[in-house]
Swiss-Prot record:
Enzyme class at the top of the EC tree: oxidoreductase
Annotated GO MF terms: cobalt ion binding; phycocyanobilin:ferredoxin oxidoreductase activity
Protein source organism: Prochlorococcus marinus (strain SARG / CCMP1375 / SS120)
Known catalytic reactions: (2R,3Z)-phycocyanobilin + 4 oxidized [2Fe-2S]-[ferredoxin] = biliverdin IXalpha + 4 reduced [2Fe-2S]-[ferredoxin] + 4 H(+)
This protein's record includes keyword Oxidoreductase: yes
Protein name as it appears in the record: Phycocyanobilin:ferredoxin oxidoreductase
Length: 247
C-alpha cells in the first residue's frame, strides 16, 4: 500500500516505515491521484541530483495522507509528512518533518496541530500524559508557528538515543490520532463545526506557505513558478467540502 522510494538516511526511513505501518490501522485507505510530473520528481541543483517521491492516500477521517521523501545528493535528505483530516471530522493535523545532513539529524518536529481554538479534549488529555524526554537541543519555533499545539516537539536530536526517543513520540502522537479518528463520527458537510475546521486548515496552509526555505530550495532546483505550483497543489492544498469516507 505504501511503497518505499529510494534509499534514505536510516533514521528517516525508520520514521517513515513506522508511519506507514500505523496508517494500516485506518479504515478505507485508498490512493489519491497525482500527476506523474508531481509524484516522482527529478532535477538538478548546483550540478547535484535532486529526487522527490510522494505517497498520497486518503481514508475515513482524512482527506489526504501525504508522505514526501526528498534527497538532494549528497548533502540533504528530507522526510515531510502531513495528514490533513476530512473537515467533517473533529481531528487535528498530524505533521512530521525531519532534515538529515551528513553530520546527523539537524531538525525534527512532530505535532498534532489544532484546526479549531483547541485540540479535542480526549486528544489533549492523552498528549498531556506522554512523558516527554529531556532533549538536549530544543529548537525555537518560526514566527508563523502559532499553528502548532502546546505539545509540539521541535528539536535537534543528539545521537541514536534521542533519535529513538523522537521515533517513540511520533508513534505515540500518531497512535492517539488514529485511535481517536476510529472512535468518532463526522459532522454534516454544512455544519458550522465543519466550516470552522475548513477555515482552520486554510489558516494552517497559509502559515506553512510562509516557510521561504521550502520555496527557495524548490525554486533553485526547478523554477519559481514550478515551486509555487508544487506548494499549492501538493504540499499545502486548500480543503474543500469533501465527501465523508465513512464505510
Amino acid at each position: 500500500m505504501f511503497a518505499k522510494s529510494f534509499p534514505l538516511n536510516p533514521f528517516l526511513e525508520s520514521v517513515a516505515d513506522r508511519i506507514r505501518e500505523r496508517v494500516k490501522g485506518l479504515t478505507g485507505v485508498e490512493s489519491l491521484e497525482l500527476a506523474p510530473d508531481l509524484k516522482n520528481i527529478y532535477g538538478k541543483t548546483d550540478g547535484e541530483d535532486f529526487f522527490i517521491f510522494n505517497e498520497l492516500h486518503q481514508s475515513r477521517g482524512f482527506r489526504k495522507l501525504h508522505i514526501e521523501t526528498a534527497v538532494f545528493e549528497p548533502s540533504l535528505e528530507i522526510l515531510h509528512v502531513v495528514f490533513f483530516p476530512d473537515p467533517a471530522f473533529d481531528l487535528p493535523i498530524f505533521g512530521v518533518d525531519l532534515i538529515a545532513v551528513p553530520q546527523g539529524i539537524s531538525a525534527a518536529i512532530v505535532d498534532l496541530s489544532p484546526v479549531r481554538d483547541k485540540l479535542p479534549r480526549t486528544i489533549e488529555n492523552q498528549l498531556a500524559q506522554i512523558e516527554i524526554p529531556s532533549f538536549e537541543k530544543v529548537r525555537k519555533l518560526p514566527d508563523w508557528g502559532d499553528i502548532f499545539s502546546s505539545h509540539v516537539q521541535f528539536i535537534t536530536p543528539i545521537g541514536a538515543e534521542e533519535n529513538g526517543f523522537f521515533l517513540d513520540l511520533v508513534d505515540k502522537f500518531l497512535t492517539i490520532l488514529i485511535d481517536y479518528s476510529e472512535s468518532i463520527e463526522p459532522d454534516l458537510d454544512d455544519s458550522p463545526f465543519t466550516i470552522e475546521r475548513i477555515e482552520g486548515q486554510m489558516y494552517y496552509c497559509l502559515q506553512q506557505k510562509q516557510n521561504d526555505k521550502t520555496r527557495n530550495v524548490l525554486a533553485k532546483a526547478f523554477s519559481p513558478n514550478w515551486a509555487n505550483q508544487y506548494i499549492e497543489m501538493v504540499l499545502f492544498d486548500m480543503p474543500v467540502h469533501t465527501k465523508n469516507l465513512d464505510n
